Amino acid sequence: ILRVFTNVNPEGAARVWRVGEPFEQVGAQFLPRLKPYSRWQARALKTLHVTKSLRSEYDHLMLQLHDAMKSDLDYQEQAGQVTMPFPSGSTWVCFSDQTSHAVMSGQYMLEQTLHLSPDRQYDTGASPLAILSRLTGRSLV
């Protein structure tokens, strides 16, 4: 997922992010804690229209990684991270699945989301899909 963000704060306030560790490091740390994928549960979610399509194992793991990072307060305090202020009027581009990030402050933002096919990416081996597939030892989609 490639996202383009623009801070349009009319009062000139920055939008402040914390950007964390490389995705492979995050995946290796949290993957052992995640619940296993259940195809029947994915089918039930789709049948009940909780999800728009059948959730893949990759989607399942990415959602859990996100939740695990947010709920682990020790990780949030101790993980390597950088504060990134984006001034009002600035635009930035981010592979949001690959970049551990959290918004710390700011409001009034525009966002455009682009979905890139994994096989069309410049370095397919660096994608979150490839990294999680390597770490689990299996295909996830």
Give the ranges of each region predicted by the language model.
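Histidine- and/or cysteine-centered catalytic micro-motif in compact active-site loops
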Residues: 7-9, 20-22, 97
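Double-stranded beta-helix
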Residues: 13-91
